[in-house]
């Protein structure tokens, strides 16, 4: 028992593990692996990232100078995703195909999809994984950056306030 009501538990499960969309009209899809683990542990943890973030994806993002802040607000045409996997140079289709980004909206007039993180688990886990590649390697410094991330981004929803910590 975690001290939450049934309704509060459902809301927390939704915030942490819901939100995947594979097409514009799809229903919200929960991450089943994370749901099973959260119910078993009776805690809201980041289970999806236990396998780690693929190195090739991080390298692709670094090559294209894709900023973490950009991942909260991506507009893309469908054509952007119609590229053979072996010749892909754009990290956005890879992020979508691997579940780091999901469809949040569609502008029919412009013919563009709005992509963002599907839920809190992915947003937090991916950002913390990226910190390892964009920050000093000292454990204490990394912990300070993770703290700044959680305080500024997760609690206050202010990515701009967090960014100076990465450049320090």
Question: Where are the language model's segments positioned?
Answer:
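Extended alpha-helical interface modules used as scaffolds for assembling large macromolecular complexes
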Residues: 28-168
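Amphipathic alpha-helical segments of the small helical/lid subdomains adjacent to P-loop NTPase cores
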Residues: 1-37
């Amino acid at each position: 028992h975690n001290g939450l009501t049934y309704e509060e538990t459902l809301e927390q499960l939704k915030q942490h593990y819901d939100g995947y969309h594979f097409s514009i009209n799809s229903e919200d899809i929960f991450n089943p692996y994370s749901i099973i683990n959260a119910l078993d542990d009776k805690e809201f943890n980041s289970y999806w990232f236990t396998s780690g973030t693929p190195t090739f994806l991080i390298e692709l993002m670094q090559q294209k100078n894709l900023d973490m802040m950009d991942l909260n607000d991506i507009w893309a045409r469908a054509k952007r995703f119609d590229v053979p996997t072996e010749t892909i140079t754009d990290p956005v289709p890879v992020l979508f195909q691997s579940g780091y980004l999901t469809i949040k909206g569609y502008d029919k007039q412009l013919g563009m999809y709005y992509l963002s993180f599907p839920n809190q688990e992915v947003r937090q886990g991916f950002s913390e994984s990226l910190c390892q590649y964009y920050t000093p390697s000292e454990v204490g410094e990394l912990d300070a950056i993770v703290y700044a991330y959680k305080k500024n981004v997760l609690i206050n929803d202010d990515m701009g306030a967090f960014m100076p910590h990465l450049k320090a």
